[in-house]
Amino acid sequence: MIAYLSGGMENAKDSGSQWRNKIKLWLKENLDHDVIDPVEIQKKTLTKYEIKNYRNWINKKPQKFNNIIHKIIDRDLSLIKNNADYIICLWDESVILGGGTHGELTMAYYFSKPVYLVLNLPINKTSSWILGCSTKTFTNFEDLKIDLLQQHESK
């Protein structure tokens, strides 16, 4: 099984790598599941120069900016459609100003991929659309882990 780790990057501390690294290790050790980590994939898809500068190109070099963003969007959505079995998403303040996580969850829902949403915001501050795309919601990663263990213990 392969989990896609969705959540804020653009506005998140360390691009959201801390929680992804923790759940990645847990999934491998406890379920022998692999992950698609967009933080790691981005390092392979874009050059260090592109990663460092693409946001500065919004106004200065809009076509160059669009080319980079299209590369990111195409890659992420293709991985969700063609490679991921399910999605784990941390929904926190870092996703509010972004758009990628919203699109990823919508795409996963459209292609009938289970979406496990870990809320780090009050549920009444969470988009109805996002809740509708979710298979299950959790208020912490420990409850998610218990659920995943129960789902996969007989497999």
Predicted feature residues:
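Conserved catalytic or regulatory cores that recognize and/or transform ribose-phosphate-containing ligands
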Residues: 1-155
